[in-house]
Amino acid sequence: MSRVCQVTGKRPVSGNNRSHALNATKRRFLPNLHSHRFWVESEKRFVTLRVSAKGMRVIDKKGIESVLADLRARGEKY
């Protein structure tokens, strides 16, 4: 399963670990993803989305119906 938020599109980014001596080694910063079930009142069913913490805040703000409409417009399955 890919590490991509279905709502915001956040994905892993690369950067460096830095020691006290400032040696750089490559690492990945992963998004804070969770599989979460949302109740969709209009469809009378639960929808499971893999969303980041920010994605959950977007759903709280815009509403699950609006977010699902955006996903449908992008052609993404949920």
UniProtKB/Swiss-Prot annotation:
Q: Name one GO molecular function term.
A: structural constituent of ribosome
Q: Which InterPro entries match?
A: Ribosomal_bL28, Ribosomal_bL28/bL31-like_sf, Ribosomal_bL28_bact-type, Ribosomal_bL28_sf
A single GO BP term for this record reads: translation
> Any transmembrane segments, and where?
none
Q: Which UniProt keywords apply?
A: Ribonucleoprotein, Ribosomal protein
Q: What does the entry list under GO cellular component?
A: cytosolic large ribosomal subunit
Membership in a protein family:
Belongs to the bacterial ribosomal protein bL28 family.
Name-wise, this protein is Large ribosomal subunit protein bL28
Q: What is the lineage of its organism?
A: Bacteria, Pseudomonadati, Pseudomonadota, Gammaproteobacteria, Enterobacterales
Give me the gene this protein comes from.
Answer: rpmB
